[in-house]
Structures are given as C-alpha cells and as structure tokens.
C-alpha cells in the first residue's frame, strides 16, 4: 500500500507508542501516519479509562461471553461498502480507507487525515463551537454534507459534533467530513434494505443534529471542567501536526 520507512518501523510494525495522538475518542486513539502525513491510523484503546462497548449477540449469551466491539473492523467494512457503491466520490465528505496495518499498539486502520489548506489537521465542529464559531456561517457546509448523505443513502448514527471535521479551503471554502459514526444501529436494518426509508432516516438525523449543535454552543461548548473529568478528548485536538 505505502512504502514504509525503516526509521519509523521495526519488523514491518509501525511505531506509534512514543507519538502523541492528535485525537482521543472513547474507544480509539488517532495518530498521524509516520510515513504518510496525509493519512492517519486509528487504534483501539487498551487503557482502563476507555469506553467499553460489548457486541450485541442477543440475550442468548451472557455478556461476559461476548467480545468487545471492534470499531475499526466495523468502520472498515462500512467504508469499503460505500466505496464499492460510489467510488472516489465518497472522498468529498468521507475519508478514504486503506485497510489495516500492524503497529506497536495493535492493529491499526489507515484512513485519510482531513487537513486545512495550510496543512494543519482540521478541527472538529465541537472544537469550533468551543472556540465560538458563528454556526450560521457554516450551515451551508452542513447542508452540503446532508445532501451528499441523502443522495447516496449513507446511513449514520446520531450526527455528533465531534464526529464532524471542518476543513478550511484556500479560497475560504468550508467542507464537512464525517470522520466517525457511519452506519445504522437498528437491529432490523430496514433503512439499509430500502433506500427511500434510508433517506427519510438520514434527513431525520440531520434535522435533529442542528438544534443540538446550537444548544451546545449556547452552553459554551467544552469547558475545562468537562475536559478534565472526561475519559476522552472531547473532540479537542491534542495537536495539529
């Protein structure tokens, strides 16, 4: 896939442990790929403060028998499915997926890393809200994302501010990328089977998201106290390198 630099790998295992992740979610940490800065590597967190989510297998099996949910495997499957459906068009609002690599922190998923025109890692909407952005100024960009999701029947879970990266273009353009949260959590995936139902569901998610963003902005965004008590990064970048 990508040439590996012997200075950053050992026995074809990419070294990440001594690097600082630019983003930390409840279950995963995101690192700049040490060989290709246009890509990132997502690895599952192993620390005790991570959010644990157990795979749903119904009530036939005790919870202790079920495996911990693998976000990476799920995301790779969904992004590959979208790519087989619409090809490179997905790159207008979604990261392209490049499969798995071995790292010293476990198996990692390689994806496009969304950056601004100046090369810095793009901030999440959650971080922009915390910085006091005027939401109305970016609503057209959000509408463009919504139209894309509806047009291609790309289902999402709740559309959350920390799962949206806002890329700033050279001419002042702004583009939203959905960097997490794709898929349908429904036990019976009717919205996947019937595109008209899927489009209705997507629109409902979009309609619910914007008022939630406005309410969060009114509350002042991520406070120092919230971030201090949190087991994840609250959508705030640790660096933009």
Language model features with spans:
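Conserved structural core of kinase catalytic domains
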Residues: 89-138
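ATP-binding glycine-rich loop module of kinase domains
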Residues: 21, 26-81
């Amino acid at each position: 896939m990508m040439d590996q630099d012997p200075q950053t790998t050992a026995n074809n295992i990419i070294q990440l442990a001594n690097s600082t992740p630019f983003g930390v979610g409840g279950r995963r940490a995101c690192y700049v790929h040490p060989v290709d800065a246009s890509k990132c590597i997502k690895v599952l967190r192993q620390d005790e403060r991570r959010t644990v989510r157990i795979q749903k297998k119904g009530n036939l099996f005790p919870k202790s028998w079920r495996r911990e949910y693998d976000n990476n495997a799920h995301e790779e499957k969904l992004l590959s499915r979208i790519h087989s459906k619409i090809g490179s068009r997905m790159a207008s609002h979604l990261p392209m997926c490049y499969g798995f690599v071995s790292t010293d922190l476990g198996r990692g998923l390689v994806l496009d890393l969304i950056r601004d025109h100046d090369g810095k890692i793009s901030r999440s909407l959650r971080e922009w809200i915390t910085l006091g952005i005027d939401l109305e100024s970016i609503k057209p960009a959000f509408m463009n994302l919504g139209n894309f999701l509806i047009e291609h029947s790309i289902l999402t879970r709740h559309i959350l501010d920390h799962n949206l990266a806002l890329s700033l273009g050279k001419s002042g353009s702004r583009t939203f990328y959905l960097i997490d949260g794709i898929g349908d959590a429904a036990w019976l995936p009717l919205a996947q089977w019937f595109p008209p139902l899927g489009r209705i569901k997507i629109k409902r998610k979009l309609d619910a998201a914007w008022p939630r963003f406005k309410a969060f902005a009114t509350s002042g965004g991520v406070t120092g106290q919230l971030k201090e008590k949190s087991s994840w990064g609250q959508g705030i970048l640790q660096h933009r390198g």
